[in-house]
């Protein structure tokens, strides 16, 4: 059917937007599944939770995995597939899984970071983009000047590209404040 990509910096509402879309499909009696990477620690008792603490606890299948291709047989009976924190999946895994599901008449909604704190795109997302029908880029609010923020800076431990954290570790910033921070 199709692939939709929701991207943006930390705290831009990517998971909230994914939750909103999944909820709409649940209300229309579509069978939904939400997948996140094993590294993601924001899921509580099989419920998806965003950084604001809002929980989607409707009827859906929830899967935590580090390999999407291994889940193909499980999700085959579902109409809508939501994938959160897509940047954590391996590039070929994400691209092949999403492409296969869309080709099998599934609606795939993928959410993830637009780039890391060095403003480098994640390989999994760059490989997926050519296969996507729709891209929605969200913005956060710059924590320094309160303008629209398209980037994320890391407060400390800048040698480690992938590190799970929230406001304790990451801050959304605009271009000017990003350049002033590094």
Curated annotation (Swiss-Prot):
It holds the Pfam family TK. It comes from the Viruses. Keywords: ATP-binding, DNA synthesis, Kinase, Metal-binding, Nucleotide-binding, Transferase, Zinc. GO terms for molecular function: ATP binding; metal ion binding; thymidine kinase activity. Zn(2+) binds at residues 142, 145, 174, 177. PROSITE patterns: TK_CELLULAR_TYPE. It is an enzyme of class 2 (transferase). The active site is at residue 85. The keyword Hydrolase does not apply. Substrate binds at residues 117, 161-165. It catalyses: thymidine + ATP = dTMP + ADP + H(+). GO terms for biological process: DNA biosynthetic process; thymidine metabolic process. Its EC number is 2.7.1.21. ATP binds at residues 8-15. InterPro entries: P-loop_NTPase (IPR027417), Thymidine_kinase (IPR001267), Thymidine_kinase_CS (IPR020633). Belongs to the thymidine kinase family. PANTHER family: THYMIDINE KINASE, THYMIDINE KINASE, CYTOSOLIC. This is Thymidine kinase.
């Amino acid at each position: 059917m199709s692939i939709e990509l929701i991207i943006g910096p930390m705290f831009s509402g990517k998971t909230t937007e994914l939750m909103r879309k999944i909820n709409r499909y649940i209300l229309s009696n579509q069978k939904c599944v939400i997948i996140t990477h094993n590294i993601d620690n924001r899921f509580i008792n099989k419920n998806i939770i965003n950084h604001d603490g809002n929980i989607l606890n409707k009827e859906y299948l929830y899967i935590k995995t580090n390999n999407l291709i291994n889940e193909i047989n499980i999700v085959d009976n579902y109409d809508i597939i939501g994938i959160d924190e897509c940047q954590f999946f391996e590039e070929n895994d994400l691209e092949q899984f999403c492409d296969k599901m869309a080709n099998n008449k599934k609606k795939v909604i993928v959410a993830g970071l637009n780039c890391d704190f060095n403003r480098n795109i994640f390989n999994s997302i760059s490989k997926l983009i050519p296969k996507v029908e729709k891209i929605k880029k969200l913005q956060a609010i710059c924590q320094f000047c309160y303008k629209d923020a398209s980037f994320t800076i890391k407060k400390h431990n800048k040698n480690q590209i992938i590190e799970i954290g929230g406001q304790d570790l990451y801050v959304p910033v605009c271009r000017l404040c990003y350049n002033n921070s590094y």
